[in-house]
UniProtKB/Swiss-Prot annotation:
Family: Belongs to the class-II aminoacyl-tRNA synthetase family. O-phosphoseryl-tRNA(Cys) synthetase subfamily.
Assembly and interaction partners: Homotetramer. Interacts with SepCysS.
Highest taxon, organism lineage: Archaea
GO process terms (BP): translation; tRNA aminoacylation
Classification via PROSITE patterns: AA_TRNA_LIGASE_II
Protein name: O-phosphoserine--tRNA(Cys) ligase
A GO MF label: phosphoserine-tRNA(Cys) ligase activity
Binding-site list for substrate: 194-196, 239-241, 281-282, 335
Catalytic activity line of the entry: tRNA(Cys) + O-phospho-L-serine + ATP = O-phospho-L-seryl-tRNA(Cys) + AMP + diphosphate
Name of the top EC class for this enzyme: ligase
Organism this protein belongs to: Methanopyrus kandleri (strain AV19 / DSM 6324 / JCM 9639 / NBRC 100938)
Alphabetically ordered keywords of this record: Aminoacyl-tRNA synthetase, ATP-binding, Ligase, Nucleotide-binding, Protein biosynthesis
Pfam family, one: tRNA-synt_2d
């Protein structure tokens, strides 16, 4: 909220007479952070890219810097295109492809039994005109004149009813629609299983209007019907693929392009090994695996033959003239492909490719600071009056902590509207201090463990120095609960309330809230939650 203008004017006037005093007095106008907006719970949120799409963007920039132009390749590939590219091997290759299918448009009848059921759902007899309009609607749906996502609304219009009733009609009057089974599309269509399937189609069209040399790249999703998904296999993945079309393309072109792209990611040395797979769309002997060395990977990745820091990262080859001839392409073409997920895993130290596609596989390793931000008070005041009560009670409890019982100390007195609030700390036992030895314990997070330790002294020193303070403490938690209950009394007409704690064995006793995700994390990692101690504090409030 803005500063009080009258007080600002007073400070301005005072500064003309005594600047140093005015400067010090100005501190009183600065608002203290409340329980709800205090660091570390107060955080400036920032966005964070997904590592997969961050890698895609880095690859896009790498290709562009290397002089390549970005294009979009077809995702839906007719089956016949696979035969043109693979020849006799196509039948085996298609086994890994997903085929597209769709639900048939049935010829739905509207006999007497359907009309009778329709009347039950409508709660009235449909008119002859309504039945005829419904019949016409179903016929139009059969012919494809009405899309599936429009059918509910069209039925509602035909019968002069609402969409909710139309949904019931589809479900109860025409249950056969739920029993429809997908049927393969004709002609057969597949989802792109590798980027090459799209490159032949794209190049055949581009070369009708452009002359070589061409340097093109495309980064997009491919689909492969794996037997199962595991740590290294997904049914959908991203390929960062490029082609070079030129009269002078050779295998060395692939080597040079691989180096140009991968050096931008910190890879320093390269080995090129003939690939034993020998795909039929490549010229025999040109399909090549690219191994690259990265100095930062020496401790995490090791190739059996090349040693630490070496990893297989890409494949390239020259397209077969046999396949090119099927598309009327007269020029040599080099194709390089980089698996985006593979590169992302290498660069980010990811062990399970599924973590890039499914949230449930993402490793969750929150920092101590992130865990500290999760710790809060279960009950806390909602008003500035309640916040002030908390501050003064905490301050007074610190000042009078060592006073011995029997004793009763006033910690707060204030007015809220026409009501007065008075808070006392009470110790009835003779010779016992007003606050026990653990009354001022603060909660820290260290290496994923939660500890409550005193604010000073030898006990807990290492935790205080190396851990992250959560911003919550025992005495403030008790004061916050008391302030919450005082606000409840102010809203209901007054009365008395007491917050009293002796030995603490669980966080809720001092009004601390630990979310389930934090508890699950600490428990799963076998961590500790040591929030306990002899508090021995009693706070009493009266609203009158």
């Amino acid at each position: 909220m803005p500063f009080d203008r009258d007080k600002l004017e007073e400070l301005r006037s005072l500064a003309q007479r005594d600047f140093d005093r005015a400067w010090k007095e100005g501190a009183k106008l600065v608002r203290e952070p409340g329980l709800r907006d205090r660091y570390p719970r107060l955080k400036v949120e920032t966005g964070e890219p997904h590592p997969l799409f961050e890698t895609i963007q880095q690859l896009r920039e790498a290709y562009l810097r290397a002089g390549f132009r970005e294009v979009v390749n077809p995702v839906i590939i007719p089956e016949e295109e696979v035969y043109k590219q693979f020849g006799p091997e196509a039948a085996a290759v298609l086994d890994r492809c997903f085929y597209l299918a769709g639900l048939p448009r049935p010829d739905v009848g509207l006999g007497a039994d359907k009309v009778e059921k329709l009347a039950e759902v409508l709660g009235r007899e449909p008119s002859e005109d309504e039945v005829e309009r419904l019949r016409e609607t179903l016929h139009a749906y059969k012919k494809g004149e009405i899309d599936g996502d429009e059918l509910t609304h069209e039925i509602a219009e035909a019968l002069d009813t609402d969409d909710g009733t139309a949904v019931r009609i589809l479900d109860e009057v025409f249950p056969e629609l739920k029993r429809l089974k997908p049927e393969p599309l004709e002609p057969p269509l597949t989802l792109r299983s590798h980027m090459t399937a799209g490159w032949f189609i794209t190049l055949s069209e581009i070369l009708k209007r452009e002359d070589p040399p061409l340097k093109l790249f495309s980064i997009d999703r491919c689909f492969r019907r794996e037997q199962r998904e595991d740590e290294s296999h997904l049914m959908t993945y991203h390929s960062a693929s490029c082609v070079v079309v030129s009269d002078d393309v050779t295998v060395d072109t692939g080597k040079a392009v691989a180096e140009a792209i991968l050096r931008q990611f910190g890879f320093e040395d390269f080995e090129f090994v003939p690939d034993e797979k020998m795909s039929k769309y490549y010229v025999p002997g040109t399909q090549t695996e690219v191994y690259a060395y990265h100095p930062d990977l020496e401790d995490s990745i090791e190739d059996e033959e090349l040693g630490p820091g070496w990893v297989e990262i890409a494949t390239f080859g020259l397209y077969s003239p046999v396949a090119l001839a099927e598309y009327g392409i007269d020029y040599p073409v080099m194709n390089l492909g980089i698996g985006v997920e593979r590169l992302c895993m290498v660069l980010h130290g990811i062990d399970d490719v599924r973590s890039l596609a499914y949230v449930e596989y993402e490793p969750w390793e929150p920092s101590d600071l992130e865990l500290a931000r999760m710790i809060d008070y279960e009950r806390k005041p909602a008003t500035s009056f309640g916040e002030r009560l908390v501050r003064e009670v905490v301050r007074g409890l610190h000042e009078h902590a060592d006073e011995e019982g029997p004793v009763e100390v006033e910690l707060f007195r204030g007015e809220f509207g026409d009501r007065e609030v008075v808070v006392h700390a009470v110790e009835e036992e003779k010779g016992e201090p007003l606050a026990g030895p653990a009354a001022f314990n603060r909660v820290y997070v260290l290496d994923g463990n939660l500890y409550a330790v005193p604010p000073e002294g030898d006990f807990g020193r290492e935790i205080r120095e190396e851990g992250v303070y959560s911003g919550v403490s025992f005495e403030e938690g008790l004061a916050a609960r008391l302030a919450y209950e005082v606000e409840e009394l102010l809203a209901t007409g007054g009365g008395e309330t007491t917050v009293s704690v002796r030995k603490v064995s669980r966080p809720s006793q001092v009004n601390l809230s630990l979310p389930r995700k934090l508890l699950r994390y600490v428990t799963k990692k076998g961590g500790e939650i040591e929030i306990k101690g002899p508090v021995f504090v009693t706070l009493r409030a009266e609203v009158r």
